[in-house]
Amino acid sequence: MVHLTPEEKTAVNALWGKVNVDAVGGEALGRLLVVYPWTQRFFESFGDLSSPDAVMGNPKVKAHGKKVLGAFSDGLAHLDNLKGTFSQLSELHCDKLHVDPENFRLLGNVLVCVLARNFGKEFTPQMQAAYQKVVAGVANALAHKYH
């Protein structure tokens, strides 16, 4: 559960309505893979990840980034039940994919950076604080099934 004020919730959802999920998702996942290269081991089937340009131009990275942000959108619609919303994804990433749950926090922080880059002055410090709460809540929900 994420505790947002009514004003924060309105602001987060208003900004999210302007997000180009295709572009932002690909950029966020791509940046994660470039900035934290050890995360690439989970994406070996994606082909060429040999350089920042290869990662950022990789169509599989872009497609998966879009998928990730689609799930994030679902989370925004269910802020009062993030653990339930992400239960199956948590189980998948824990039991089958064996993803380090710290990677969820890293991706959330990268997403905040990408939103700031894309929205400039509209992404105020207050907006950042609200989004940090959301990405922390999503990361916590995704890590829920880990033992």
Swiss-Prot record:
It comes from the Eukaryota. It holds the Pfam family Globin. Keywords: Acetylation, Heme, Iron, Metal-binding, Oxygen transport, Phosphoprotein, Transport. The modification N-acetylalanine is found at residue 2. Residues 3-147 form the Globin domain. Changing residue 99 to M: In Wrens; unstable. GO terms for cellular component: blood microparticle; cytosol; haptoglobin-hemoglobin complex; hemoglobin complex. GO terms for molecular function: heme binding; hemoglobin alpha binding; metal ion binding; oxygen binding; oxygen carrier activity. Changing residue 5 to S: In haplotype T11; Kenya. Heme b binds at residues 64, 93. The modification Phosphoserine is found at residue 51. Heterotetramer of two alpha chains and two delta chains in adult hemoglobin A2 (HbA2). HbA2 represents less than 3.5% of adult hemoglobin. PANTHER family: HEMOGLOBIN FAMILY MEMBER, HEMOGLOBIN SUBUNIT DELTA. This is Hemoglobin subunit delta. It comes from Homo sapiens (Human). The gene is HBD.
